[in-house]
Curated annotation (Swiss-Prot):
A single Gene Ontology CC term: outer kinetochore
GO molecular function, one term: microtubule binding
Family designation: Belongs to the SKA1 family.
Coiled coil: 48-78
Cross-referenced InterPro entries: SKA1, SKA1_MBD_sf
Species this protein is from: Oryza sativa subsp. indica
GO process terms (BP): attachment of mitotic spindle microtubules to kinetochore; cell division; regulation of microtubule polymerization or depolymerization
Keywords: Coiled coil
Name of a matching Pfam family: SKA1
Name the record gives this protein: SKA complex subunit 1 homolog
Amino acid sequence: MDAGDASRLGESLDAVSAAFQSRVMELQELVLARNMYPATAIPDLAAVDVSLTAMEAQLQAVRRRLQEEREAFPKAKKLVQQSLKQQRRLQLMLANMPTGMREDVFATPLEHNSSMMFPESLNFSSAVPEVRDHDLKIKEEPTAPPKKGRGPAPRWYISTEELDSLSSYMRGRLTLEKVNIAINEVASYADGNAHLVACPKKKLSEDTWEKALVLRDIAARESVKGKHFFLETDIKGPGLKLDTTGKAILTVLRHLGRFQETRIGHHRVFILSKQQ
């Protein structure tokens, strides 16, 4: 039932109520005509009045209920739209996920059952086991947890359309899988750096503490504060190296807005962008 149906039903109930009241008035006149003495007509009229009052109360209750449902329609519609938008986003992420990472999608159960929803119509690789929706979760890289109060580093994978939109010179021999594996790898670098920034000194070795001090100084800069980042010196493979292919991948990711690049001191800093 939509809002228009509810409105028409309310109008129909008004018409029924008016017809009922008209019929009661006719019955009252007939009772008076049948009973020549008012004393004998009063009990009949009282019984009719009681019945009418009960009917009116029921009609009012129905109208209130219809009004409540009509007011709930916009909220329900908005919720459905948000659910569809989230579903499309997850479908896009899954469609552009590297095949080498899909096996990890089903590794552990969800921490929050409502955080991931995959439609049953999606067809996965035959190597992926059949599972139920509440068993799905993208496995995080085995890095230390990020700073408390901050979520994991964004993994904004590129789509086939974005890769095809690049010039052949920029794209070169890059594939969707190579680029998205690199995205996952740099996000793991950023997660590791966030952990070092938040970790107390007593839990770090002397060498690691020196790096943590450098990262904390960078994280305190206004352009970096509150964001996930990694350094050029973090890039050590295996999915991304500072070779010709790795530099081409960094150029593509910068062009597609996956990160912003800046220089702080003698460090080349890459600040990850969140998906719009």
